[in-house]
């Protein structure tokens, strides 16, 4: 998986597009069961031309197939997504209060990924167009906010419930990424996920 992702990144760096590899990863999550191009635009917050270009790019790499019904992951795409899901089982939009880091917030559950440089992750999110990021740890049924509290529930019961609703398991990390709009938030989230996944087997 690492080699495939690096190859795709190099290609996009050589020939820049209106989308990045992060959008491709997120599109794979959304296109698993098949969906229309218009729906993909809505989900990713990208324009028609950008989505059209991204679909063409994904077809070139045999990740999706298209028909009148829309786009759907190929066998290769499903295989790659299953490998990604080992490390990132869930991505979703989330409504938060205390933990909010932007007008739009998205959460990703990270499993088996060791993260030691929290500030570096936050800086990376801002560099890729996001407004901020928070990294959480799920331990013994509690949500830890590093350097703040060992139990989110003691600060915001509502946010604790929202985080638990996305289904983290013991030892998981959860990254919250915020942005001004859907497109910039997902671009930042996808870029960070790519950075983390590129170092996994």
Residues covered by each model-derived region:
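Short alpha-helical segments that sit at the start of domains
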Residues: 1-25
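Short capping segments at the starts of secondary-structure elements
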Residues: 30-36
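A short acidic, leucine-rich amphipathic alpha-helix
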Residues: 39-44
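Short amphipathic alpha-helical interaction segments
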Residues: 45-60
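A short, conserved structural fragment
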Residues: 59-69
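Basic, amphipathic "hinge/linker" alpha-helix immediately C-terminal to the N-terminal HTH DNA-binding motif
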Residues: 69-84
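Long, charged amphipathic helices and adjacent flexible linkers at domain junctions
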Residues: 88-101
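Mid-protein regulatory/catalytic core that forms ligand/cofactor-binding pockets
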Residues: 99-199
């Amino acid at each position: 998986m690492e080699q495939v992702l690096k190859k795709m990144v190099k290609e996009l760096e050589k020939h820049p597009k209106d989308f990045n590899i992060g959008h491709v990863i997120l599109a794979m999550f959304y296109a698993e069961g098949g969906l229309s191009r218009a729906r993909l635009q809505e989900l990713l917050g990208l324009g028609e031309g950008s989505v059209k270009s991204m679909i063409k790019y994904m077809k070139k790499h045999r990740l999706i197939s298209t028909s009148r019904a829309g786009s759907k992951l190929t066998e290769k795409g499903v295989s790659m997504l299953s490998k990604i899901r080992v490390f990132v089982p869930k991505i979703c939009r989330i409504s938060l209060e205390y933990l909010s880091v932007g007008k739009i917030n998205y959460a990703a559950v990270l499993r088996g990924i060791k993260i030691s440089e929290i500030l570096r992750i936050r800086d990376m999110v801002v560099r890729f167009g996001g407004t901020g990021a928070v990294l959480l740890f799920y331990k013994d049924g509690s949500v830890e906010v590093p350097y703040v509290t060992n139990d989110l529930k003691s600060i915001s019961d509502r946010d604790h419930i929202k985080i638990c609703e996305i289904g983290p398991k013991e030892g998981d990390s959860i990254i919250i990424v915020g942005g001004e709009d859907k497109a910039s938030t997902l671009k930042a989230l996808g870029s960070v996920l790519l950075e983390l996944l590129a170092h996994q087997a």
